[in-house]
Amino acid sequence: MRVKITLACTECKNRNYHTTKNKKNDPDRLELMKYCKFCKKHTLHRETK
């Protein structure tokens, strides 16, 4: 089952991206390098509720 998640920038804490993930394949929190338009650079984004 796919669930909706939000990805937040670890530097400025803005919630920039919304996506889905499969809880069965990825039970732990997702971490991706994404572009943050507020920091104006690629930063680590972590899954939030």
From Swiss-Prot:
Keyword Ribosomal protein set for record: yes
A single GO molecular function term of this UniProt record: structural constituent of ribosome
Any single GO CC term annotated in Swiss-Prot or TrEMBL for this entry: ribosome
Record keywords: Ribonucleoprotein, Ribosomal protein
InterPro entries xref list: Ribosomal_bL33, Ribosomal_bL33_CS, Ribosomal_bL33_sf, Ribosomal_zn-bd
Pfam families named among the record's database cross-references: Ribosomal_L33
Single GO biological process annotation from the record: translation
UniProt entry tagged with the keyword Ribonucleoprotein: yes
UniProt cross-references to PANTHER family, sorted A to Z: 50S RIBOSOMAL PROTEIN L33, CHLOROPLASTIC, LARGE RIBOSOMAL SUBUNIT PROTEIN BL33C
HAMAP family: Ribosomal_bL33
Family membership noted in the UniProt record: Belongs to the bacterial ribosomal protein bL33 family.
Official protein name in the record: Large ribosomal subunit protein bL33
Organism name: Thermoanaerobacter pseudethanolicus (strain ATCC 33223 / 39E) (Clostridium thermohydrosulfuricum)
Gene symbol of the encoding locus: rpmG
